[in-house]
Structures are given as structure tokens and as C-alpha cells.
Amino acid sequence: MIGKPRGRRGVNLQILPSAMTVLSICAGLTAIKFALEHQPKAAMALIAAAAILDGLDGRVARILDAQSRMGAEIDSLADAVNFGVTPALVLYVSMLSKWPVGWVVVLLYAVCVVLRLARYNALQDDGTQPAYAHEFFVGMPAPAGAVSMIGLLALKMQFGEGWWTSGWFLSFWVTGTSILLVSGIPMKKMHAVSVPPNYAAALLAVLAICAAAAVLAPYLLIWVIIIAYMCHIPFAVRSQRWLAQHPEVWDDKPKQRRAVRRASRRAHPYRPSMARLGLRKPGRRL
């Protein structure tokens, strides 16, 4: 009598991650409908909802131990719709339809998202990747590409018409985003980022400010996120190169890696670039 309800509840919970993925697809497709009806605010809100559901479904699957090959395939298809097709069509309908090149650049973006997702799936099955590879994306992830696209619409909503709504700038930005998607540039995964304990209070303060900005100035917050993400890329490249040169720390925790890097800097105070330029530390004689 008691075992059956528990079993039934277990089966129901197993489909929860896939149900969340399907809901995210519905949100993404409905965003296109609102864009066609000239309601960009609703379209942007639904894309954000799709992104939130996309970020949660995988975590819920791991918590419930409900990971499956079918769920992974559905999630990949949802990413293609929500972060490839939907942002492209929303931006085209809202801003690019009057420009002859508009359709070409949104097609380029959508195709690059699909190629990027295909490469990601292929790398997941590649057993030859180094141990640190799971900490980095290869190229810009699809959700970040969608934020970059919606950022153009956010500029228009915040500041109205201007050079940022011109055909040449829109084409340049969309093309640049498309190139980043299929590039080989390493970009840090969020779950691989660790915050030292002494910065925890500052991080919580930043999160509180972001929560307030999401209500008071959501369009500006989108651009703060875009700029912050772009600024992290050089640090991600540097981190990936350092890890590639130090296989002895691949299995270490972030705190231990930071200690190794500090020790390395103390052991080699002069960087190669300083030596090439003939630079020296202040107060030292040649």
C-alpha cells in the first residue's frame, strides 16, 4: 500500500527535468509570437524565462538522478530553439527587417549556434580531452550569444534610436557574436568559478545590487552582464593556457591552484615581457 505511491511519485519526478525543458521551448517560441505582435518587452521576458529554465533543468536532473540520453538531446534541441532561432527572429522582426542584410546576419547567427551546439555535443563524447577541459567552454556558449543579441534590443528600449540601431552596427555586432560562438576561444564555465571566502560578502552585495537593477534598470543590467562577460575572456584564455602548462594541478582545488600560481610568481619575479623590454623593479640597480 505504501510502496506504490512512492514508486508513482518517483516516476513523476523523473520526468520533471524534461518537462522543464519543454516549457523552456514553449517560452522561446512564444517570444517569437510576441515579437511578431510588436511586444518586445514580453519577448525579452520570455527569452529570460527560457534561459532560467535551461539553467535549472540540468541541475534538477542531477539532483533527482534523472539524467538520460533523451533528456540531453531534448536539452540540446531546446538550446537551438531558445538561443538560436528565437533571438535571431526577435531581433530581425524588431530591428533588422528594414535592412537588406538583416536576414543574412540573423541566418548566420542561427547557423553558428547550431554548429556550436553540435561541437559541444561532440566534445562531450571525446575521451581524449585533458582533465581541465570540463572547466571551459570552447567558444561563446549559446545562452551568452542570446544575451548578446538581446542586448541590441535593450539598447533601443533604453535609449531609443541612434547609431546603435543602424544597420552597419547591428550587422557588425551580430557577425562578431556569431564568430565568437564558433571560435576556439576558451570561456570559463560558471560552475567552475570559485570565490575565495573573504570575497563572499562582496559577492552577496553584488548579487543584491543586480537583483535591484533587474527591477529598476533591466536594460542597463543586460549590458553590464555583456561587458562583464567580454572582460572575463582574456582571463579565461590566460587561465586555460596556465593549466595546459601545469598538468600537476589538474586535479587540485582552486585554492591549491592559486597557491601554486603565487609560489610560481614569487619564484620568477621577472616576467618574460619585462625581460624583453629591459624593465626592472623600482629601487633595483642594473
Swiss-Prot record:
Single Gene Ontology MF annotation: CDP-diacylglycerol-serine O-phosphatidyltransferase activity
The EC code for this enzyme is: 2.7.8.8
Q: Which controlled-vocabulary keywords does the entry list? A: Cell membrane, Lipid biosynthesis, Lipid metabolism, Membrane, Phospholipid biosynthesis, Phospholipid metabolism, Transferase, Transmembrane, Transmembrane helix
Query: Which Pfam family name is an example for this entry?
Result: CDP-OH_P_transf
Q: What is this protein called?
A: CDP-diacylglycerol--serine O-phosphatidyltransferase
Q: Which BP terms in the Gene Ontology apply to this protein?
A: phospholipid biosynthetic process
Q: Which Gene3D superfamilies does UniProt cross-reference here? A: 1.20.120.1760
Keyword Transferase listed = yes
Localized where?
Cell membrane
Q: How does this chain sit within the bilayer?
A: Multi-pass membrane protein
Q: Which organism is it from?
A: Mycobacterium tuberculosis (strain ATCC 25618 / H37Rv)
**Reactions the enzyme catalyzes:** a CDP-1,2-diacyl-sn-glycerol + L-serine = a 1,2-diacyl-sn-glycero-3-phospho-L-serine + CMP + H(+)
Give the CC-aspect GO terms: extracellular region; plasma membrane
The primary site where this protein sits is membrane
Q: Does the keyword Transmembrane helix apply?
A: yes
Q: Which InterPro entries match?
A: CDP-alcohol_PTase-I, CDP-diaglyc--ser_O-PTrfase, CDP-OH_P_trans, CDP-OH_PTrfase_TM_dom, CDP_ALCOHOL_P_TRANSF_CS
Q: What class of enzyme is it?
A: transferase
> Which parts pass through the membrane?
15-35, 74-94, 95-115, 135-155, 167-187, 207-227
